[in-house]
């Protein structure tokens, strides 16, 4: 019996080594809520109903009991590291210069009416740099996040960069993972707070038209940025460039590789990588991970 149990364990070992869940659904569908549940440290901290051991009313109760007991035993539960797709979109802004960002805000202002645009630019700079800025012209040629730009350069120049990292690189690997899963989320939320309260009106292309759309500036801005990245590989360029439609998902995959590499180095032969992507909105991006 023990041999059979060991054989089953061996069969499912590969699945246990690496689990990647890509959440998908419209905004407000509950993807972020699910991601928070998956990133919970301990299964006992989850607000789950008790599982039955007998007197099942229907098959779903029985299935729930089996899954619950399986996950609760032998410390099988391990929290998932969450990669927030919107924050990875935001990273494309941070790796560039302030001038790129200013120019893109100017470009957006040709599409929607942004009041006090120059003041908004100044506020954004102060949020991103965490410093008081009197004259934004003085810093416009600076890269917003130099460290991020260096990391991206390494990833672009060497497709095997993550796989080449060794135990002596653990500190750097941890630093990169923390940046992409925590620090950049904080930076994006600060940026969001500056734009989220601003409502903008679409500039009418037809002077006779009385109907114009109204948008939340943050949502409009990030949607445009995401579309451009998927189209050209650059957040400020809306041209269609063949091969660039997977630019965003390739970066997400680089972060997946980082998390998996850290697990390999820290727990050799006992790896249990758990990753959740919140969220995939594009069918090509979903297929990209399915193919892997």
Where are these regions (language model features)?
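Glycine-rich phosphate-binding loop of ATP-dependent small-molecule kinases
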Residues: 1-278, 282-292
